[in-house]
Amino acid sequence: MTSPIRSVLFASLGALPLTVGAASLPDTLTIPGEKIFPESLTSSTDGSVIIGSISQKQIYRVKPGSDTAEVWIPAGTDGLNNTFGVFADNRTNTLYACSNLLGPPGVAPAVNATLYAFDLKSGASKAHYVFPTGKGICNDIAVDAQGNVYATDTSNMEIVRLKKGGSALEVWAGNGDFGKPADHGILDGIAVLGNRVYANTLMTSKLFTVPIGADGNAGAVAEVQLDHEISRPDGMRAFGKSDVLIVESGNGGRLSRIALNGATGKVTTIKEGYPDGPVSVTVVGTTAYVLEGQLATLLRKPGAPADTTPPKPFKATAVQVGKP
């Protein structure tokens, strides 16, 4: 049986739109170096694009006007490890990041999943919060209008929450509602639209919605009924008041837009053809950047034939999405 740690790497998570003209933005953002294996990207209102790396255990930033990422938050900063989801909360000047210490398949992490908070301008560490359930894997992050932070725990199939002003994470939704942990459904991408949290499962290709109650507690989890199937969904971001942009790693990879109305949704394909495995998307003005993680290379089994293909650059590519 595939281990939760090995499975999550198949998953590989937002920011406010920027008032930046599409013509001023590069077509490709490159992350120099080998074995970067990025899992998520986000963007801030100054035009920066921020990228997390699984293997290098650090966070990169593409400065406004540049097309090349530079190391911004080095590995080991305040204990930062394998970096998955990143999310820029511009309202609080905070970059949230998922950190995991991954070991060999079948071996529990030596350190439980941790949600980090960094200063969005300086990169200085603000705080970190350990996941409440053991053997957790922090995958992706979203923030609601009140400032509450939500993150997906892939291995435990839970959504955890950090209340605004809180000092500890708590389990907010789960209890088998997204699938049993033993089934390795991989709870992955997450986004907030109004008073609803949306989350997807990579391996079972499902999208779920959870109402946020007036008291902040989670309502009943429901699977979103889509007008056509999605395939291996990964990172997604809120796009306007009622839509999400979502990357799908199945069927050759694609970027889709889903118009949501509670527990129903209409899927529109924006672009197809991401052969290196799309893992995340962020929006800068009217431009979306789709990040490809090349995680199939990272997941090559021990003893498998050597890959003689020349290394490809790690990159995020632009696609016009217009205004929400």
Predicted regions and their residues:
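A short loop-to-beta-strand structural motif that recurs across blades of beta-propeller domains
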Residues: 58-60, 113-116, 158-161, 206-208, ...
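A short helix->beta-strand "capping" segment at the edge of beta-propeller domains
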Residues: 23-36, 319-322
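Beta-propeller blade signature
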Residues: 111-121, 305-323
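A short beta-strand motif characteristic of beta-propeller blades
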Residues: 25-31, 68-76, 124-131, 170-182, ...
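Short loop/turn segments that connect beta-strands within beta-propeller blades
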Residues: 63-67, 119-124, 163-167, 211-216, ...
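Asp-box/WD-like beta-propeller blade repeats and closely related beta-sheet repeat scaffolds
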Residues: 109-146
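Conserved beta-strand positions in repeat-built beta-propeller and related beta-rich domains
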Residues: 50-55, 89, 95-110, 149-155, ...
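Beta-rich, blade/repeat-based domains predominating
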Residues: 32-49, 54, 77-101, 131-149, ...
